[in-house]
């Protein structure tokens, strides 16, 4: 089960635009894994072919947290079903915990599990712009966006 940032809305069009892979809304996850997180992070940055196409994270980092255990932080923009778990599996990592720490402009921060908060005015403004534009034209991280080449394996 994934935990962390979850956006709730009654706007079906906005929900579709925010979650559809073609919108390329960036999401950041921290996966606590067993395996070689350092090697996996290097491999992930080169791209990993899954059954539904190439996964190319925009950012990856790994931090050892114990013997054979790592926190691997990944930022992805595709948002395909179980993409992070499938990516980790393809890299021979066993996922123990998966936390979505950021979804577009919304950061988890110090919000405790099971707690909720309203979006800030700025988050609402950015989400409105993203859903109006279809997501691709607005980089929610404020930095440079890495170009990705998508290949379908069909």
Locations of the language-model features?
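Basic, flexible Lys/Arg- and Gly-enriched helix-loop patches that mediate nucleic-acid binding at interfaces
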Residues: 1-154
């Amino acid at each position: 089960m994934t935990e962390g940032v979850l956006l709730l809305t009654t706007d079906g069009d906005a929900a579709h635009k925010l979650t559809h892979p073609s919108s390329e809304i960036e999401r950041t996850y921290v996966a606590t894994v067993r395996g070689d997180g350092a090697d996996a992070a290097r491999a992930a940055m080169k791209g990993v072919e899954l059954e539904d196409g190439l996964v190319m994270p925009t950012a990856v980092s790994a931090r050892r947290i114990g013997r054979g255990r790592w926190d691997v932080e990944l930022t992805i923009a595709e948002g395909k079903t179980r993409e992070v778990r499938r990516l980790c599996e393809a890299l021979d990592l066993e996922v123990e915990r998966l936390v979505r720490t950021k979804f577009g402009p919304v950061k988890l921060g110090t919000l405790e599990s099971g707690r909720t908060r309203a979006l800030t005015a700025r988050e609402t403004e950015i989400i409105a712009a993203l859903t109006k534009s279809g997501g691709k034209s607005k980089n929610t991280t404020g930095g440079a966006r890495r170009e990705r080449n998508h290949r379908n394996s069909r």
